[in-house]
UniProtKB/Swiss-Prot annotation:
Native species: Escherichia coli O45:K1 (strain S88 / ExPEC)
Function per UniProt: Catalyzes the formation of methylglyoxal from dihydroxyacetone phosphate.
One of the Pfam families matching this protein, by short name: MGS
Name of this protein: Methylglyoxal synthase
EC number(s) per entry: 4.2.3.3
Matches recorded under PANTHER family: METHYLGLYOXAL SYNTHASE (PTHR30492:SF0)
Molecular function via GO: methylglyoxal synthase activity
Chain positions recorded as substrate binding sites: H19, K23, T45, G46, T47, T48, S65, G66, H98
Record's keyword terms, sorted: Lyase
GO biological process, one term: methylglyoxal biosynthetic process
Every MGS-like domain range: 6-152
Active site per UniProt: D71 (proton donor/acceptor)
One term under GO cellular component: cytosol
Catalytic activity: dihydroxyacetone phosphate = methylglyoxal + phosphate
Amino acid sequence: MELTTRTLPSRKHIALVAHDHCKQMLMSWVERHQPLLEQHVLYATGTTGNLISRATGMNVNAMLSGPMGGDQQVGALISEGKIDVLIFFWDPLNAVPHDPDVKALLRLATVWNIPVATNVATADFIIQSPHFNDAVDILIPDYQRYLADRLK
């Protein structure tokens, strides 16, 4: 597949997602990094977003809850180039009914080459990166060329 460049803006659009057993871990992480996160645009699946907003007072664009389609909504935003970073604390020790949605979300984040953290250590590395508040170029699939080739 041919690639093109997308610029992640200095003011990032960050998706926050956490499975039930990981919500408190994400809440603690958000509270610890609140001053920095407040400079960006936040999205989250339903329950997680409402919990974050209630605990911190931050504005969070809440989707549906993950099992009700929220993971897929976040995935769609990634595909549309509207999410720049995914922080997704998922529970690897407990299966969830919407496991296919979880796999699809992680697959889309990989396809569209956005930074992804699935644990606290990686989330800390991302948010503490010297480039976190900078505009950064990433390579993404050239969808227009892909579509043109498919329609030949």
